[in-house]
Regions:
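Cytosolic catalytic domains that perform sulfur/thiol-centered chemistry
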Residues: 1-278
Length: 278
């Protein structure tokens, strides 16, 4: 059970630390259509982490898939990230894309990576300064190195094999309507439903407003799922919100965790795979 979340007060006190690097993981396209309260500003000194392009596998037809380790390391160094860097990630929705970036550095072996609980909303509403989100500058090349944790990223073949082995329990972070197949998918070429034997924990059920629920509330949620001794693989539409519930689980549990990188977009658009509807 890790110390993953930091407060605006903690971050403000750290601003003068030379090892601190703040990563703005906000999506420029806002594909999800989430409400953005504070546009065009960022936390002073924040560096834009381009999750949609630079830090996704552009050879894949799927959104947000993990880039090669080599590319991840190269682009991290371009952002000036070092092995000793203290990384704090936030986004402009509250908690949305930032857990994905936290997870990426976590599984690449970086120890000091945190999420600003509540994101830019909490920062501004606690009275801390912002700056205009200008174009990115160039940074001194960092020395970041990393090694992708074995079994942290699940492929389509891994999930197909798991249908028989049942080594991992799949937890789907999509809304109940999408999971049950009663609501349409945002990508019209993706079928409705869910992977057989997966369970549903909509990501907004671990949040209260723009922040994570308390640890006591999260403990109750995960206890109700009866998953204490299971290895867990997290699924969503495209690998973003799965990381929200993965992070929530790591605040209160000690399961082995992974993310199905292609998530429902891959499963629901691949012919011949079994699909359940509840």
């Amino acid at each position: 059970m890790e110390n993953i979340l930091v407060s605006p007060e903690w971050l403000n006190e750290k601003l003068s630390d030379p090892n601190l690097i703040i990563l703005d993981a906000s999506e420029k396209s806002n594909v999800a259509g989430k409400k953005i309260k504070y546009e065009g500003v960022r936390i002073p000194g924040a560096r834009f982490f381009d999750l949609e392009n630079t830090f996704s596998d552009k050879s894949s037809h799927l959104p947000h898939t993990f880039p090669s380790s080599e590319n991840f390391i190269k682009e991290s160094r371009q952002l000036g990230i070092n092995n000793k860097s203290i990384l704090v990630v936030y986004d402009n929705i509250g908690v949305y894309t930032s857990p994905r970036v936290w997870w990426m550095y976590k599984v690449m072996g970086h120890k000091q990576v945190y999420v600003l609980d509540g994101g830019l909303n909490e920062w501004v509403e606690n009275g801390f300064k912002t700056e205009v989100a200008a174009s990115e500058g160039e940074y001194q090349i960092g020395d970041f190195s990393g090694d992708l944790e074995k079994n942290a990223v699940d492929s389509l073949e891994d999930i197909k094999a798991n249908l028989l082995s049942k080594k991992k329990l799949l937890i789907d972070a999509r809304t109940r309507g999408r999971f049950n197949g009663t609501s349409p998918e945002p990508r019209d070429w993706v079928k409705n439903g869910h992977i057989p034997a997966s369970i549903n924990l909509p990501f907004d059920e671990v949040l209260k407003g723009s922040k994570f629920k308390s640890r006591e509330e999260l403990k109750a949620i995960f206890k109700s799922l009866d998953i204490e001794d299971r290895d867990l693989s997290f699924v969503c539409g495209s690998g973003l919100t799965s990381c929200i519930i993965l992070l929530a689980s790591e605040l209160v549990q000690q399961n082995k965790t992974s993310v199905y990188d292609g998530s429902w977009t891959e499963w629901g658009s691949t012919d011949g795979l079994p699909i359940d509807h509840d």
